Regions:
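Mg2+-dependent phosphoryl-transfer enzymes with acidic/Ser/Thr/Gly-rich catalytic loops
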Residues: 1-5, 23, 181-263
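Asp-based phosphoryl-transfer active-site loop
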Residues: 4-19
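Short active-site oxyanion
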Residues: 37-41, 60-62, 147-150, 204-205, ...
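Short, structured coil segments at secondary-structure junctions
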Residues: 57-60, 68, 165-168, 221-222, ...
Length: 263
């Protein structure tokens, strides 16, 4: 069955962790796929406000899965919008103050940081290139709007203690230093299901690319799930195909392998 839509994680899939850029081979491959009529979608854990590293292909993008699936949209139309219950947002904010860890609070259009810690700068600013967050922004105005995602900076061990405080939420970790928390049902796989219904295409007509734990649901849901060569082993285990790394033409090579573009 011909592929009609391709879904791409950003960090570690589209964008290299080494160069913080989209490789030229990836840009060219996506341009070629677009010319063949394939719709191009972003599938990221990032909030909309901090998608700041895909300018090279932004003009090619047909729609977005963001906040790990809590908000999915095409143009100005929201396909999914799934906020975290307000009392569970407050529970995490209170816990972060008590245990002294940082939390990025993510609304539909804005983000704010609670309890700034150096680990935030190390990971988000230096490693991920997120340099457009004002750490002095207060979180209270943000808490008056629906919160779609919380990103606490704590270990996997702490996660096992803290996440149960939020019984209606799920955790999707793609970095050892933090995790993304969304409401139950908000994951990339479910977002893909809603998008395909809206577009009138089948899951078998979709290919998805990813490298982190938060990509596993969409790789398992799409007709073809592709893990990058630099992906976690758990991600590779659920993929239909493992391509080369983001820095070694991984997306181009997979497109050629599945006949989406010519060599």
């Amino acid at each position: 069955m011909a592929i009609k839509a391709a879904f791409f994680d950003i960090d570690g899939t589209l964008v290299s962790f080494q160069t913080h850029q989209i490789p030229a081979s990836t840009i060219k491959a996506i341009e070629q796929a677009k010319e063949q009529g394939v719709k191009i979608f972003i599938s990221t854990g990032r909030p909309v406000a901090i998608i700041n590293n895909i300018d090279a292909i932004r003009h090619l993008v047909d729609g977005y899965i963001t906040f790990n699936g809590a908000r999915t949209f095409i143009d100005d139309k929201d396909i999914t919008l799934m906020p975290i219950p307000e009392n569970e947002v407050r529970a995490m904010i209170d816990d972060a103050s008590r245990r002294d860890y940082a939390v990025l609070v993510c609304g539909r259009d804005d983000v704010a940081l609670h309890n700034h810690k150096p680990i935030f700068d190390e990971i988000f600013v230096h490693n991920l290139g997120v340099n457009n967050i004002d750490i002095n922004n207060p979180i209270e105005p943000l808490l008056s709007q629906p919160v779609l995602q919380l990103t606490p900076f704590f270990s996997e061990v702490a996660e096992q203690e803290i996440v149960p405080l939020m019984p209606h939420c799920i955790s999707a970790r793609w970095n050892p230093c933090f995790t993304d928390i969304t409401v139950q049902g908000a994951d990339k796989g479910n977002a893909l299901r809603q998008l395909t219904k809206y577009l009138g295409i089948s899951l078998d007509e979709c290919i998805a690319f990813g490298d982190g734990g938060n990509d596993m649901s969409i790789l398992q849901t799409a007709g073809i799930g592709v893990a990058m060569g630099n992906a976690n082993e758990s991600v590779k285990a659920v993929a239909d195909y493992v391509t080369s790394s983001v820095d070694d033409d991984g997306i181009r090579n997979a497109f050629i392998h599945f006949g989406i573009i010519n060599n």
